[in-house]
Regions:
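Core AdoMet radical
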Residues: 1-48, 132
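Auxiliary Fe-S-binding modules of radical SAM enzymes
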Residues: 46-152
Length: 152
C-alpha cells in the first residue's frame, strides 16, 4: 500500500499491443499489468502543478518507437478514454543501442514524420497536459554509462 507515500509517479507506457510487448520486452501481458498500475497510481495522487514545477501527480511517459506510430496513437486514445486529464510526456529520445539484428524495424531513430504524426494527433485531440521532446533528444550522448560514476 503506497497511499500517501508517493508524490509524483512517472510511469512508462510503452506498448498496448501484446505482439509488440512480447517481441520487444518478452512480456505478453504488459499492457494488462501496466494499465492496472496506471489506474492505481492515478487513484493515489492528484495533479498539483504550478506551471513551473509539479508538486504531486502523475506524468505518463510514452516513448515513440520507429514504425509504431499507430500503437502510439492507440496509447493516446487509451489515456484519453481511461485516464483523462493526466499529463503525458511524448518522448522522441529512442536511440538504438546494441545488436538489433533481430529487430531491424527499430534499428533506427524515429523520423520527423513519425514524431509529427503522433504529436499532431495528440494536439488535435486536445491533450493540453502534454510535455514533448525535441527530436535532437535521440542522441547517444544522453545515455548514461551505467558504470556507477557519481554514485556514492
Amino acid at each position: 500500500e503506497l497511499d500517501g507515500l508517493i508524490d509524483i509517479y512517472l510511469p512508462d507506457l510503452k506498448y498496448i499491443r501484446p505482439n509488440k510487448s512480447m517481441r520487444y520486452s518478452k512480456a505478453y501481458d504488459y499492457f494488462d499489468k501496466a494499465s492496472l498500475a496506471l489506474k492505481e497510481m492515478r487513484r493515489q495522487v492528484k495533479d498539483e502543478f504550478d506551471g513551473k514545477i509539479m508538486k504531486s501527480g502523475m506524468i505518463i511517459r510514452h516513448l515513440i518507437l520507429p514504425q509504431n506510430t499507430n500503437s502510439s496513437i492507440e496509447i493516446l486514445d487509451y489515456i484519453k478514454s481511461n485516464l483523462p486529464d493526466t499529463y503525458v510526456s511524448l518522448m522522441a529520445q529512442y536511440t538504438p543501442c546494441g545488436d538489433l539484428s533481430d529487430y531491424p524495424e527499430i534499428n533506427r531513430k524515429i523520423t520527423k514524420r513519425e514524431y509529427d504524426k503522433v504529436l499532431n494527433y495528440a494536439l488535435y485531440n486536445s491533450f493540453d497536459k502534454l510535455f514533448i521532446q525535441e527530436l535532437s533528444s535521440a542522441d547517444k550522448s544522453f545515455i548514461p554509462k551505467f558504470d556507477f560514476t557519481g554514485v556514492l
